[in-house]
Design a protein with these regions (language model features):
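Nucleotide-sugar donor phosphate/pyrophosphate-binding loop at the beta->alpha transition
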Residues: 132, 142-162
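Short alpha-helical donor nucleotide-sugar binding micro-motif in glycosyltransferases
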Residues: 164, 280-281, 288-293
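Carbohydrate-associated surface elements
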Residues: 176, 196
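Conserved donor-binding/catalytic core segment of Leloir-type glycosyltransferases
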Residues: 209-240, 367
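Nucleotide-activated donor-binding/catalytic signature segment of Leloir-type glycosyltransferases, i.e.
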Residues: 263-281
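Aromatic "clamp/platform" in nucleotide-sugar-dependent glycosyltransferases that forms part
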Residues: 301
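Short hydrophobic beta-strand element within catalytic cores of glycosyltransferases
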Residues: 318-322
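Conserved acidic donor-binding segment of nucleotide-sugar-dependent glycosyltransferases
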Residues: 333-334, 338-345, 355-360
Length: 396
């Protein structure tokens, strides 16, 4: 699929799409998984569910963080094994052992990340067992301190790059990340397969925690994990700069480590009467927000290919997207909204105001372009490409 400069491929040089007749046992490995909330978790879960729908067997290995009452269970047809860590390295990397886990009947191992202990130990176990390994590189995380950036560079050279080079196939979500990995010294073919989304099938329902506003007051929505990555501070600063009457109401949906911070920040905001903090919403409520918002705002500091962007596009809702990791270019090329500089509250405020001032034809054009472009990102199409990679590394 070609979209502007975004070229998504899943076949190596000279390769044709592979058949998909034989059922496979696929092991998906990601540190975080349900009930943890995050884009990477959803990516792994949705691929797993789509593979199960096609008759494949899927197992997930993940760390038991946060601790869950069940260590082994089935969810959506996927067998989940949560591994208890002995400790948490740096607050983000669970120290786990996979020595007592069995992958003898696994056909292909699909790693989702490059650096964590779980990923590297599973890679070692799989290579010793002669199992083909596929690794997806999801994101380039921003470190806030000089020490953090230095450690990140060292870990990449010693661990991250080695994970990809030791794999039988590597996947990146966008052309931006392919170019980034080339600058980081990655060699060999990389498949470009985007993140996906599943349209919400439940009927839309207005969030119960969203106050009734006048019908004439447009709604702008933020949907996502409440974290430094997602740029909530930038969004709140932008709202303060809009004054006491911005001409719209902002709804913030999600939970995360900044939930307490957001509660305090909201209470002290000069625009607090125009902001509602909803907490975690259901899929039906999320769908309502997309379908009833003038735009969805994504002020992130770094992203792979966020699900909320794809879901908003599918709903025909214009998007205001921070220009991180090439995503501003995607929004502009498909014509689904506006791109703003990262960490720039004034530009974000201006973009939200511009959406409010747009006439019906412009709003319809943004929405229609996004809806049309979103079709190639639905999980059935994404999984087709992932299966092509599996068949290729299996030599089928």
């Amino acid at each position: 699929m070609i979209f502007g400069q975004w070229v998504f491929s899943s076949n190596g040089p000279g390769q044709q799409p592979m058949g998909t007749s034989r059922p496979l046992h696929v092991l998906l490995v990601h540190v975080w998984y349900w009930p943890h909330v995050g884009g990477g978790d959803q990516h792994v879960e949705q691929i797993g569910r789509e593979l199960v729908r096609r008759g494949h067997r899927v197992t997930v290995w993940c760390a038991d963080v946060p601790a869950h009452e069940e260590r082994r269970f089935r969810r959506g047809g996927v067998d989940v094994i949560r591994i208890t860590p002995s400790r948490l390295l740096g607050g983000v990397d669970p120290l786990v052992s996979v020595s007592d886990l069995d992958l003898s009947d696994v056909d292909v191992v699909h790693l989702h990340d490059t650096l964590p202990v779980l990923i590297r130990r599973t890679l070692s176990k799989a290579k010793k067992a002669g199992k083909p390994v596929v690794t997806t590189y999801h994101n380039d995380y921003v470190k806030k301190t000089a020490l953090g950036r230095a450690v990140k560079r060292i870990r990449w050279v010693l661990q991250g790059r080695r994970t990809i080079h030791s794999s039988d196939a590597g996947i990146v979500l966008t052309p931006f990340f392919e170019q980034l990995l080339r600058t980081k010294g990655v060699q060999g073919h990389l498949d470009i397969i985007p993140n996906g989304f599943s349209p919400v099938e439940e009927a839309p329902r207005r969030p119960s925690s969203l106050p009734k506003t006048e019908e004439s007051t447009p709604l702008i929505s933020f949907v996502g994990r409440l974290s430094f990555q997602k740029g909530l501070d930038v969004l709140m600063d932008a709202m303060d700069s809009c004054g006491s009457n911005p001409g719209f109401h902002l709804a913030i949906a999600g939970k995360g480590q900044l939930s307490g911070w957001l509660e305090d920040r909201h209470a002290n905001s000069s625009a607090k009467e125009n902001i509602s903090v909803l907490g975690l919403v259901t899929d039906a409520e999320k769908r309502w927000m997309y379908e009833n918002s003038a735009c969805v705002v994504i002020p992130s500091r770094f992203e792979g290919l966020p699900t909320v962007l794809l879901e908003a596009m599918h709903a025909g809702t214009p998007v205001v997207m921070a220009d991180v990791n090439g995503l501003g270019g995607l929004v502009q090329e498909c014509g689904c909204g506006l791109s703003v500089p990262c960490e720039d509250p004034n530009s974000l405020a201006q973009a939200m105001s511009r959406v409010m001032e747009a006439d019906a034809d412009q709003a319809s054009a943004w929405g229609g372009s996004g809806k049309s472009a979103s079709r190639d990102y639905q999980w059935d199409r994404v999984t087709d490409r992932v299966l092509d990679v599996y068949r290729r590394v299996l030599g089928e």
